[in-house]
Amino acid sequence: DPSVADENDPFATVPELDMYEPDNGWRPWPEPCTYDPAWLARYRAAQVDRVARIDAIAKASIAESVDAGQRVRGLDKAGDVAAWREQRRRAVFTQYLTIYRTLADPAYLDLSIDADERPMGSLFAFPDPFEANYGRGGLARTMTARGWLSTWSGLSSHAKLADTMPRVTVPTILVHPTADTEIRMRQAKEIVDSAGAADTTYVELAGAPHYLEGHRREALAIVADWLRARFA
């Protein structure tokens, strides 16, 4: 949620960037919402800015631990126990980040954004994303500094299919459920298109949700036929 104004205050909000603000197009669940494309562009840019701010907090924490580790190596544990103890505990310390409001994709409520067959809402909301954004649980809410940087940061993580798929050269199939509330068809196609394999297959599983409930046999048959044609 890019409208978070203070990482230490879950209620501190920049109204102009709040997707749950009526002036920006939000309506209470289950009414559909409509977000202006120009506002949405500012929103997406602000999301990147917030990730950068969290990255800076995480990197500063890691740098402090590294610096303390370098200092402790120069200390005589037997000769200066107090100084060694202080720097050693700083060196091994792991900061935990509480990352508030992580369920804030306007596409959850505005189905005209990357239109597909998905319903309103999110896999992680029960059912209202507004409540899930502020409620307990959610994605990446409590992370170590290294955990945030390596897995969730869109700027620092190396776990990016855009970077890794070009190195995948084996035959590749992607079965995309068209009613997935989390992954857009555009994104699924981009994943396949970026693959380094000469043999790629993209299949849309019409009406299937994220975990393929009600469509798993169909998905299994698709994958089995694909494997049989290449490896039987």
What are the roles of these predicted feature ranges?
Residues R167-T169, L174-H176, D180:
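Short beta-strand/loop motif that positions the catalytic acidic residue
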Residues A179-I183, H210:
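Acidic catalytic loop of the alpha/beta-hydrolase fold
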Residues Y202-A208:
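Short glycine-rich catalytic loops that host catalytic nucleophiles or stabilize transition states
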Residues P2-V4, A208:
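Active-site nucleophile loop of the alpha/beta-hydrolase fold
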Residues V4, K160-L161, V170, R184-D193:
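Short alpha-helix in the alpha/beta-hydrolase fold that links the catalytic acid
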Residues I222-R230:
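C-terminal alpha-helix
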Residues A5-K160:
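Alpha/beta-hydrolase
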